[in-house]
């Protein structure tokens, strides 16, 4: 009997130590996408760059005046984890790995389109960022995760990991987490290896190397990411469990005015604003500032924070997101605060006023101009994403579509000097409140907002 009881105890202990096959599964097997000898399973498409196998490596070689070239899998993949090693010869070009991508010979003039994980050996150092080839362009520039810019090593093989599960894409370079994108397009597509177009003889003949290419497609489990990685979330008015777990909150729920009020009282404006189809929109009053519904502000106050928001301008429109708004000034027009300018730079006259462009899109209004490139600005009528980070030490940054466009030290001597020569010099201690409301401005033009999210920093 003692022996039987001992055996029973051992059985029970072993049973509970075993993985529960009904609730947890090991990841499925890895499948090689490259046999080390041939290009079987791959097709060449778009461009004229050369692809061949050398010493167990796929080698792509640039060709002058060719468009972007791709070696793509014959198979289409939905959810997967992809790993490979890559090396690039030239620092004047770039490359990338297409994921869930497509080829449309008619509508896209024979071009590949879809998400691309960047290989960028330039001084910009955006390797591991996510680019939408031949469509929306940059989804995840590495200004959003500057610490990862040093992950890619020039002149040597770099291990790249890409995880596509559900509508999420995560990337790693040499085991360093880089990008996190939640998207609304392309749940499946091919995998591709890019050789970028070149236009000079000096750039021609440069090589890109790919090896150890393998994929996992079954029993997948999302990998953990550190708490401080910013998520580009293209699902309107939605937070992922990751974002919620790390302190993000929606300031606009997509349905109601909960959390917002008029600067003129404790209720939301009865006119001048509308909430419909997941948007909060300030309506036109023919450019008359605060003459219709007036500005709206959050009910809560914020001190150090990271706030991002999508905005869509109509032609010639002007608005803004202000921060550290106290409402103490009791102004008749728009309330006073530091302002992330939201503006149609081409059609609104304010873009030509102020000093050195400090009233243009994404600028710190009337104080610091945004240093931005046209190609990172989405057209009027399309969505752009603004972002403001105020750190606990009063360092402040503005971003436009994931690219940092300015930074400053709130309360510094330089800041005080800028205020002294601005329209705000009549307000004592302008911009220096310990905490304040977040404000959406009524400047008399129709502008829509969505996906307004905030994380308090400590």
Q: What are these model-derived regions, one by one?
A:
Residues 21-458:
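Carbohydrate-interacting regions of secretory-pathway proteins
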């Amino acid at each position: 009997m003692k022996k039987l009881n001992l055996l029973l105890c051992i059985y029970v202990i072993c049973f509970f130590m075993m993985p529960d096959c009904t609730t947890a599964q090991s990841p499925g097997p890895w499948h090689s996408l490259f046999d080390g000898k041939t290009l079987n399973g791959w097709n060449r498409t778009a461009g004229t760059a050369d692809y061949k196998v050398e010493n167990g490596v796929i080698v792509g070689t640039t060709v002058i005046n060719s468009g972007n070239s791709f070696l793509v899998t014959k198979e289409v993949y939905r959810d997967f984890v992809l790993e490979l090693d890559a090396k690039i010869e030239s620092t004047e070009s770039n490359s990338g790995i297409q994921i869930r991508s497509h080829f449309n010979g008619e509508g896209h003039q024979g071009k590949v389109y879809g998400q691309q994980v960047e290989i960028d050996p330039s001084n910009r150092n955006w390797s591991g960022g996510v680019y939408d080839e031949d469509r929306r362009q940059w989804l995840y520039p590495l200004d959003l995760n500057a610490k990862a810019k040093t992950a890619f090593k020039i002149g040597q093989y770099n291990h790249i990991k890409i995880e596509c599960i559900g509508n999420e894409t995560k990337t790693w370079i040499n085991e360093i987490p880089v990008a996190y994108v939640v998207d609304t397009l392309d749940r499946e597509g091919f995998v591709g290896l890019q050789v970028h177009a070149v236009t000079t003889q000096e750039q021609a003949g440069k090589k890109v190397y790919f090896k150890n290419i393998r994929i996992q497609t079954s029993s997948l489990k999302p990998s953990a990411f550190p708490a401080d990685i910013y998520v580009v979330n293209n699902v309107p008015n939605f937070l992922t469990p990751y974002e919620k777990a790390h302190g993000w909150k929606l300031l606009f729920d997509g349905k109601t005015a909960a959390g917002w009020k008029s600067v003129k009282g404790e209720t939301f404006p009865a006119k001048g604003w509308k909430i419909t189809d997941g948007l909060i929109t300030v309506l036109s009053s023919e450019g008359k500032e605060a003459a219709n519904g007036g500005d709206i502000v959050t009910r809560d106050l914020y001190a150090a924070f990271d706030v991002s928001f999508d905005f869509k301008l109509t032609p010639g429109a002007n608005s803004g997101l202000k921060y550290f708004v106290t409402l103490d000034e009791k102004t008749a027009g728009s309330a006073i605060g530091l302002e992330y300018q939201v503006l149609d730079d081409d059609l609104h006259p304010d873009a030509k006023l102020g000093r050195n462009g400090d009233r243009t899109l994404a600028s710190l209004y009337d104080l610091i101009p945004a240093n931005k490139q046209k190609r990172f600005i989405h057209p009027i009528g399309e969505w752009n994403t603004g972002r403001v980070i105020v750190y606990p030490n009063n360092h402040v940054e503005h971003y436009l579509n994931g690219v940092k466009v300015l930074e400053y030290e709130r309360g510094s001597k330089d800041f005080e000097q800028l205020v002294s020569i601005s329209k705000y010099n009549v307000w004592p201690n302008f911009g220096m409140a310990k905490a304040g409301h977040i404000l959406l401005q009524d400047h008399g033009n129709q502008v829509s907002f969505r996906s307004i999210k905030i994380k308090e920093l400590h």
